[in-house]
């Protein structure tokens, strides 16, 4: 009988995941600076991975089960079956802008930038969700129709609307406005980090 392959998240969900395992049926151990986790059940192989990667790895059959966030299941559109809400790491996906900006929502922001013929730049790790959200904004549909916002990464540019751009973030997204981008789409639990970086939430994309 082959081992059960179990992927667990590294990063913001890591500590809570280890507490969950330690309070369950098994002892947990690992060596520092390694991604291998050992349970006292020899039938389970555990590896720590980035939560962004886990949905697709489970969908492709490389792992039998994994722990990740709903945000990454939604973003990757992976063909997986959510089994249980573990009820930790409660976050929401939001749009935030500098607190000096007067826009009430992102729809108003799109309309104003289009009126002034300014390029609107948004930074996010969530490229799929960002593009979908923007295309569903009334002002975007009115001005740009069915055009796709331009998604910009270090290795790729896709989309046919350079007037609204989504820039891939590799983290510390809240640090990018206002010099590098005009807005961000990011996850937050309490909003404290956003406020500390002079940002305010104007839209909630997903809870």
Task: Give residue spans per PLM region.
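Domain-level signature for soluble enzymes in the chorismate/prephenate branch of the shikimate pathway
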Residues: 1-207
């Amino acid at each position: 009988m082959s081992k059960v392959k179990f992927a667990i998240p590294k990063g913001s969900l890591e500590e809570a995941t280890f507490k969950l395992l330690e309070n369950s049926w098994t002892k947990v151990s690992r060596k520092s600076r390694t991604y291998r986790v050992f349970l006292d059940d020899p039938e389970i192989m555990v590896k720590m991975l980035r939560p962004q990667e886990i949905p697709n790895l489970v969908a492709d059959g490389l792992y039998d089960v994994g722990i990740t966030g709903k945000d990454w299941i939604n973003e990757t559109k992976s063909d997986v079956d959510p089994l249980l809400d573990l009820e930790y790491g409660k976050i929401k996906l939001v749009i935030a802008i500098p607190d000096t900006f007067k826009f009430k929502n992102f729809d108003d922001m799109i309309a104003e930038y289009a009126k002034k013929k300014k390029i609107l730049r948004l930074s996010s790790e969530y490229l799929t969700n960002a593009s979908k959200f923007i295309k569903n904004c009334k002002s975007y549909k009115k001005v740009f129709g069915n055009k796709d916002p331009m998604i910009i990464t270090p290795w790729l540019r896709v989309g046919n609307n350079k007037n609204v751009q989504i820039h891939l973030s590799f983290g510390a997204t809240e640090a990018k406005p206002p010099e590098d981008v005009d807005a961000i789409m990011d996850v937050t639990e309490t909003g404290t980090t956003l406020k500390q970086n002079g940002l305010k939430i104007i839209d909630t994309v997903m809870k």
